[in-house]
């Protein structure tokens, strides 16, 4: 690695998150649940790590990929849409993409969609030829149009994309959609999904080799312990041996059953991790199949 591309030597890890927006609070909750705490500076943009040498930078979400690329931050929590847009832009300009997605975080889900005025009779993508498409994601859209061999004009806007067709500056839009309420309010309807997005943990492709390496490995393990347990519960019950096969068939989203030491009651003590919703109906089905003393326990964190 040349000196110009080498990562700066530091003994503290830096994470960038959105200063204010829909990903801010979920990102802070995740990091706090991983055991991190901070002392906030006067300007409220830099938070000094207290529990661990892991500092937090509060910035605009579209600055996060660049801060990682420049080595200013080691990690960033950002929407996949923003990360992919800047990566696509760099590739289209012949620049390397020095960062990567390390983990999907399963919050901030949305979709990048093509949406047309409600009065359109939509049939297929051939209708896009020659049309003007307003978007804040020109590089992703350009790649998609190129892949589908569609010649259309991209109208780049930094915001308020939904109003472009009503203003006459575009025929349709390509924008993020969560519930679809904003589209409906502007008499638009989604027709094609370009990509799915969620919050991701991004980092350099070239990982640090100094004191930050151990911190990074530890933090990734903790994040895995939080994210992988999302919507998971520990299920415990008693059952006779002859009922275990039937009970296992009722738990397709569970880990293999673990039998605990016999306490002399004549029934087996069993536990498993379920990775889906355990409703009252499921518990009643398990009870009818032979499970006794059913308990559902919330699991906050785990090291696998």
From Swiss-Prot:
HAMAP family: HisG_Long. Disulfide bonds: none annotated. GO terms for molecular function: ATP binding; ATP phosphoribosyltransferase activity; magnesium ion binding. GO terms for cellular component: cytoplasm. Coiled coil: none annotated. It comes from the Bacteria. It catalyses: 1-(5-phospho-beta-D-ribosyl)-ATP + diphosphate = 5-phospho-alpha-D-ribose 1-diphosphate + ATP. Its cofactor is Mg(2+). It comes from Xylella fastidiosa (strain Temecula1 / ATCC 700964). Catalyzes the condensation of ATP and 5-phosphoribose 1-diphosphate to form N'-(5'-phosphoribosyl)-ATP (PR-ATP). Has a crucial role in the pathway because the rate of histidine biosynthesis seems to be controlled primarily by regulation of HisG enzymatic activity. It is found in: Cytoplasm. This is ATP phosphoribosyltransferase. The keyword Magnesium applies. Pathway: Amino-acid biosynthesis; L-histidine biosynthesis; L-histidine from 5-phospho-alpha-D-ribose 1-diphosphate: step 1/9. The gene is hisG. Keywords: Amino-acid biosynthesis, ATP-binding, Cytoplasm, Glycosyltransferase, Histidine biosynthesis, Magnesium, Metal-binding, Nucleotide-binding, Transferase. One of its GO terms (biological process) is L-histidine biosynthetic process. Belongs to the ATP phosphoribosyltransferase family. Long subfamily. The lineage of its organism: Bacteria, Pseudomonadati, Pseudomonadota, Gammaproteobacteria, Lysobacterales. Its EC number is 2.4.2.17. Its main location: cytoplasm.
């Amino acid at each position: 690695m040349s000196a110009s591309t080498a990562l700066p030597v530091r003994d503290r890890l830096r994470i960038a998150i959105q200063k204010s927006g829909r990903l801010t609070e979920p990102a802070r909750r995740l990091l706090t649940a991983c055991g991190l705490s901070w002392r906030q500076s006067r300007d409220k943009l830099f938070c000094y790590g207290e529990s661990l040498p892991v500092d937090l930078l509060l910035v605009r979400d579209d600055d996060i990929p660049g801060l990682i690329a420049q080595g200013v931050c080691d990690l960033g929590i950002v929407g996949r849409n923003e990360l992919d847009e800047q990566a696509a832009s760099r590739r289209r300009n012949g620049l390397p993409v020095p960062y990567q997605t390390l983990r999907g975080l399963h919050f901030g889900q949305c979709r990048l969609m093509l949406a047309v005025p409600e009065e359109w009779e939509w049939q297929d993508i051939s209708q896009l030829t020659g049309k003007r498409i307003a978007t804040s994601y020109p590089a992703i859209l350009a790649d998609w149009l190129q892949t589908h061999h569609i010649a259309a004009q991209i109208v780049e806007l930094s915001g308020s994309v939904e109003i472009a067709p009503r203003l006459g500056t575009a025929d349709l839009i390509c924008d993020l959609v969560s519930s679809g309420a904003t589209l409906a309010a502007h008499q638009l309807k989604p027709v094609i999904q370009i990509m799915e997005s969620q919050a991701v943990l991004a980092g350099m492709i070239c990982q640090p080799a100094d004191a930050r390496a151990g911190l990074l490995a530890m933090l990734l393990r903790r994040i895995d312990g939080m994210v992988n347990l999302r919507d998971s519960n520990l299920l415990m019950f008693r059952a006779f041996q002859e009922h275990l096969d039937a009970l296992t068939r009722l738990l397709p989203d569970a880990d293999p059953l673990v039998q605990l030491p016999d306490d002399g009651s004549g029934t087996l003590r069993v536990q498993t991790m379920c990775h889906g919703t355990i409703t009252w109906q499921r518990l009643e089905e398990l009870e009818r199949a032979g499970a006794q003393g059913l308990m559902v326990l919330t699991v906050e964190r785990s090291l696998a």
